[in-house]
Amino acid sequence: MKTYSAKPSEIEKKWWVIDAKNVVLGRLASRVAIMLRGKHKPSFTPHLDCGDNIIIINAEHIKLTGKKLNPKDGKVYYRHTGFPGGIKDTTAGKILSGKYPERVIKMAVKRMITRNVLGAKQMSNLYVYANCEHPHMAQQPTIYDFASENPKNKK
C-alpha cells in the first residue's frame, strides 16, 4: 500500500470554538497546536496547511498551575529590543491582568508550532478573544468541549 499524501484541493477545514474559562493553559495550547497542524486528521500531510480554524473565547479566564502566577518566582516571558543590554521581561500575571490577556494563549501555542513559513500560516488560523464574543458566527463554528475531555483539563 502506498503512502497517502493529500493535495491542497482535497483539504477541508472546519471551524472550532473553544471556551478557555477555567482551563489549564498548557493542556489547551498543546491540543490547539495539534488541531492547527491537522495532526488529528487521518489525511495529515506534513508539508501542507491541513489544520482547522480555531476560535478561543474567554482567554482572560485561563488558569495556570503551580506558582506560575506568583509575581516573585512565577512564569517570566523575555524579549529583546535589539540594543545591547536590551533584555526586557514580564510575568504571566501582568499579561493576564493587562490590556491583552489573549497574548498568553497565543504565545503558548506559537511556541508549540513549527518555526517556519508553514507555521506562520497555521498560526493565522488561530483567533483568540479575551471575552465570550467573537465575530465569526457566519462561519458556523462547532463547539469543542475541551474542559470535559479530561478532568485534568479544568482547574
UniProtKB/Swiss-Prot annotation:
GO terms for biological process: negative regulation of translation; translation. GO terms for cellular component: cytosolic large ribosomal subunit. Keywords: Ribonucleoprotein, Ribosomal protein. InterPro entries: Ribosomal_uL13 (IPR005822), Ribosomal_uL13_bac-type (IPR005823), Ribosomal_uL13_CS (IPR023563), Ribosomal_uL13_sf (IPR036899). Pfam families: Ribosomal_L13. It comes from the Bacteria. Gene3D superfamilies: Ribosomal protein L13. One of its GO terms (molecular function) is structural constituent of ribosome. Part of the 50S ribosomal subunit. This protein is one of the early assembly proteins of the 50S ribosomal subunit, although it is not seen to bind rRNA by itself. It is important during the early stages of 50S assembly. NCBIfam families: rplM_bact. Belongs to the universal ribosomal protein uL13 family. This is Large ribosomal subunit protein uL13.
